[in-house]
Each structure stands twice: as C-alpha cells, then as structure tokens.
C-alpha cells in the first residue's frame, strides 16, 4: 500500500468523529478491503468548474462532511479575497446527506463572516441560479449530483451572475482547498448562525418571483387544448412543487403525478438511475400513462435542471432525444416570435459543439443566428451575458444541450427543467390543436430539412488506472490522428485544446468572431457532412464519443450512426 495513502488514512482515523464514517473507516482497515481503502484515499475529489461530485462515504475521494467543509473553506477564502462583505445563496436537492452537507457549508461560511441565504427545503437547481441573481449574492452553492445514481452527491458553485464559475475561479478555489486541512475547519453551529443573522432563511418571495419570471416567457394568450392531459414525474427529486405550480398557473389543470415518485427520496427506490432520458426511469410514468391516456408524459431529473418526455404515438410511447426536443422548441419558439411580429434575423440561439447539427440547418433556412459553445451550460450563460452587455438581451431565443438541458428566458444562467416543462406542454398543446403530436412534428422537420441524427458511445474507465487510460486515449487521438472512421474519410480535424474559433451560422453576427476557451475535445469531420467528437466526461470516469450523421431518410441516417458507433467503440476499446 502506498505510504502517503496510509498516512492520510491514519489521519482520518485519528480525527473523524461521525459514527457512520468511523464505522466505514473500521471496515476499510480490514486486509480484504485494501483496494477500497486505496480508492477512497489515493486522491482528493477534483474541484472544477462543475464543483465536486462523487460517491458518499469516508475518504478524500468521497463526498462527506469533511470534504464539504474543506471545499467551503476554500470558497470562503476566495470570496473574502475578491469581495467586500460577500454573501452566498445555498440550496440542496433530495439526495442523501444533503441536509447535513448544507448545514456544514452554511456553518463554514458563517464562521468566515459570510452571510448565507439558505433555502429551508429542497429546491431545483434553477431556483438557486435565480436566487443568486435576485438576491445579488457573491456566489451560490447547490448540493446535487444531478441524475447520478443514489450513492452520489455533489457540490456545485455559481458565480455572482448565477452561472457556473470560470476556469480561472475554479483553479483559484481549488488551490485554496488544497491548502486547507479538513480537520482544522470549524463550522459555526447552524442555530448560532441563525441567531447571529449570518445564516438567513431564503425569503419565500424569491421562489414566487422565480415562478413569475418563468411565466413571462409563456406564450401570450396560451390556452390548453380541450381535454389536454399531462402525466408528470419528478423522479423522487425536487421538481414537484414548481412544475405542478407553474402548470396550474398557466391553466393546465389535468396533471396526473406518478404517486410512487412524487415525494423526495434520495434513495431513488423506483429507479436506480434517475435520468429522464432513459426509458427505465420512466417505467412507472408509462404505466400510469397507459391508464389515464395523456397527451404528454414529462419527467424531470432529481435537481430539476433536465427534462425528458414520452409521446403517445400509434399505440406506443416514443421518447424524444434531448437534441430533438431542443430542435422542436427552437423552431416553435421562432414561429411564436414571428407571430408576434419579431424578425428571425434578430434572434440568437445557442447550443454546444456536441449537440445536434440540425439547428445550423434551421438557422440557414430561417435566418436566425446560431452560436456553438463548449460543453457546459455556463458557456451558454456567457452568451446571454454578452447580449445583455450589448443591450440586446431580448435577442436570446433559447439555449440547449444534447443532454436534455434547456433554457428559455434570461432569469437564470443554468438549464431549467421548470421553464422547459412549461413550454414543452404549451408546444405539445399547440400541435395537438393542429392534430399533430410532437413525434409527428419532429418528423415533419426531418422531412423538410433532412434526417440529422446523433449517437453517443460511452467508455467507462474507473479508478486510478482508468484516469491514466483516458489520458492515453486523448493523447493518441492527437499524436496519431485518425484517417478514417468506419468507411468515412476524415476531411478535417479541430483540436479544441488549441482555442478554436466559435462556430456561428447566419443571423446578424454584429460582433467580432469569438475564440472558445481551450478544452480537451477533438472533432473529426468526415465526408458526407458526418462527424465524430471525442471528449472525457466532466463528471464521470468516461470518454464520450459523439456521433453525427445525416441522410435523406431515417433508415439511411440510422445506418450511418450504427457504422460510426462501431468504429468509435474500436477507438475507445
């Protein structure tokens, strides 16, 4: 066993007092648990622009109260160095240990003289982004692991604009964290913080104003089609209150909530992987849908920043991909804007380099500007800020990621499943009044513009050996570029580690060309306007391969995706 790992382990055994963590340390001390001990202590959880994320447990490579305290002290040092009298907004989702972590984070901030606004109950991620902006705090923290399985939790940091922190801020906070001994951090008692006015319950008006901000992007004069019915599931997460409230306030009253998934439960007892993009997570919703026959099934993930849908079509339920929903919303919102007398060429939509190519085709046909940014919603938020700084915030049409994240409106700087659900319901009702479901609406767009399809190949590389393998794969793709992918010749390569120019299509393009930040992403452009992009996941030990193909028919495009998928698997094997 590595001597430094054992030194760290013994330090934890000497200092940890929490009963569950003490018990886990005892289990790790057994000879047969050597591999588990090593994995828990061989490194510290990496703090990046997405904060921290890991499985709950004891050790430097796990999420626990000591790691949360250490991270918060690093953040507190950063805030006190950059702000006079800094303040923070703090929230959590329904995950295990979330309340414990929230109290520790609030206590550390209070002990550093930083006033912190704490949501008194679980809340969706977008409400925290909104709270930072509404309360004008210096930063925000949300304790979440998005749609990861139940053993995970995380720690996500927002800047004073409600967006994820920059690479520079993350690097400085990370350096601060590295200097902190977690056992030297002494959080203020939560009740003491409340008494001293350093810990403040977030006022109810913040949530009320969040709902009002969302309603402002509702389609004017919206009225649900006669008999329109929705099935909704929050997947035992945070979306229940906000989603049901917003639907009621726009006049959608026939909403059936999946009862087994209505209440918050960090164990996620009904699905091991509460990710609304997968049919397995929607099984209970589909079962209820079979009984009540809705027009639409909507699911939000545990922190309610992502939304998935199932569409009743020809006696079955079809799941739309994140790309398809993004394209549908984009085209429909543009149509709604035109009906209000707004010009398409004035509008700006933003997506990522790994999302569908179809919005570029839409932009050329309809005249709006389409911008492509790096993966991560903070980059979409940056584009909103640029429009705001130019006095053109109203040009923002929408932003979306292929991973089921959408934002319409400028009330937040992160993806928002609450506003996405509202608009998806309105859009589906609009099409229903025209005797179309969303699957048929999407197919109509494919027939008009071409079948631009996508696929993803994930290759998992867990543990210390996995991290080295991931680095080796990306290095090899740079040093020994592919000449073909499947039967397709490579016609161009973009290495985003070299700060490539931001791709833009159509529109006014009044600003000078923008350069994207350096990122560990490699794009291979293939003949026939097909494409493959490789990048390591920012939150999981995986290398992802994003596949792009098009065809005159669905079958043709699907065959090309299958061929690219097989080739990508060989590259990642």
Question: Where are the predicted features?
Answer:
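An N-terminal, well-structured beta->alpha segment
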Residues: 4-105, 192, 199-227, 238, ...
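Conserved phosphate/anionic-ligand binding catalytic regions in large, soluble enzymes, centered on
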Residues: 41-61, 145-146, 234-242, 246, ...
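N-terminal small/polar loop signature for handling phosphorylated ligands or for N-terminal nucleophile
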Residues: 89-152, 249-309
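Active-site phosphate-binding/coordination module
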Residues: 127-185, 302, 313, 402
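Short beta-alpha connecting loops at secondary-structure transitions
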Residues: 154-165, 196-198, 266-273, 309-318, ...
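Phosphate-binding and adjacent anionic-ligand microenvironments
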Residues: 290, 294-296, 336-535, 542-546, ...
């Amino acid at each position: 066993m590595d001597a430094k790992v054992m030194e760290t382990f013994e330090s934890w055994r000497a200092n940890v007092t929490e009963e569950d963590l003490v018990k886990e340390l005892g289990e790790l001390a057994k000879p047969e648990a050597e591999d588990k001990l090593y994995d828990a202590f061989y490194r510290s959880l990496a703090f990046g622009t997405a904060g921290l994320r890991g499985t709950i447990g004891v050790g430097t490579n796990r999420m626990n109260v000591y790691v949360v305290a250490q991270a918060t002290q690093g953040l507190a040092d950063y805030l006190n160095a950059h702000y006079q009298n800094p303040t923070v907004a703090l929230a959590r989702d329904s995950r295990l240990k979330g309340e414990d972590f929230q109290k520790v984070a609030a206590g550390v901030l209070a002990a550093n003289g930083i006033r912190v606004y704490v949501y008194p109950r679980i809340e969706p991620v977008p409400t925290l982004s909104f709270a930072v902006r509404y309360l004008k705090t210096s930063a925000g923290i949300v304790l979440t692991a998005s749609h990861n399985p139940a053993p995970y939790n995380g720690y996500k940091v927002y800047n004073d604009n409600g967006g994820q922190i920059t690479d520079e801020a993350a690097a400085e906070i990370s350096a601060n964290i590295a200097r902190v001994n977690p056992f030297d951090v002494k959080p203020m008692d939560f009740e003491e913080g409340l008494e001293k006015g350093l810990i403040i319950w977030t006022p109810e008006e913040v949530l009320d104003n969040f709902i009002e901000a969302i309603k402002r992007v509702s389609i004017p004069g919206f009225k649900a089609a006669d008999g329109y019915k929705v099935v909704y599931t929050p997947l035992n997460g945070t979306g229940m209150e906000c989603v049901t409230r917003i639907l009621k306030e726009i006049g959608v009253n026939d909403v059936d909530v999946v009862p087994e998934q209505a209440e918050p439960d960090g164990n996620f007892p009904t699905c091991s992987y509460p990710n609304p993009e997968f049919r397995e997570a929607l099984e209970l919703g589909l079962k209820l849908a079979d009984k009540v026959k809705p027009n639409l099934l909507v699911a939000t993930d545990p922190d309610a920043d992502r939304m998935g849908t199932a569409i009743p079509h020809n006696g079955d339920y079809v799941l739309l991909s994140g790309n398809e929903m993004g394209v549908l919303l984009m085209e429909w919102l543009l149509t709604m804007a035109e009906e209000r007398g707004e010009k398409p060429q004035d509008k700006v939509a933003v997506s990522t380099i790994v999302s569908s190519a179809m919005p570029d085709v839409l932009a050329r046909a309809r005249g709006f500007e389409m911008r492509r940014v790096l993966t991560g919603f903070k980059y979409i938020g940056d584009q909103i800020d640029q429009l705001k700084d130019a006095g053109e915030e109203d040009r923002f049409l929408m932003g979306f990621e292929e991973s089921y994240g959408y934002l319409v409106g400028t009330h937040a700087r992160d993806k928002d499943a609450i506003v996405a659900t509202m608009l998806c319901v309105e859009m589906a009702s609009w099409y229903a009044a025209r005797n179309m479901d969303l699957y048929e609406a999407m197919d109509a767009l494919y027939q008009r513009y071409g079948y631009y399809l996508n696929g993803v190949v994930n290759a998992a590389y867990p543990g210390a050996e996995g991290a080295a393998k991931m680095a080796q794969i990306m290095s090899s793709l740079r040093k020994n570029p592919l000449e073909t992918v499947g039967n397709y010749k490579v016609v161009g390569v973009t290495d985003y580690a070299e700060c490539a120019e931001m791709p833009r299509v159509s529109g006014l393009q009044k600003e000078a060309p923008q350069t994207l930040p350096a990122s560990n992403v490699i794009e291979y452009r293939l003949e026939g306007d097909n494409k493959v992009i490789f990048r390591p996941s920012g939150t999981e030990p995986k290398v992802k391969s994003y596949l792009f193909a098009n065809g005159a028919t669905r079958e043709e495009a699907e065959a090309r995706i299958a061929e690219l998928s097989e080739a990508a698997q060989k590259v990642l094997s």
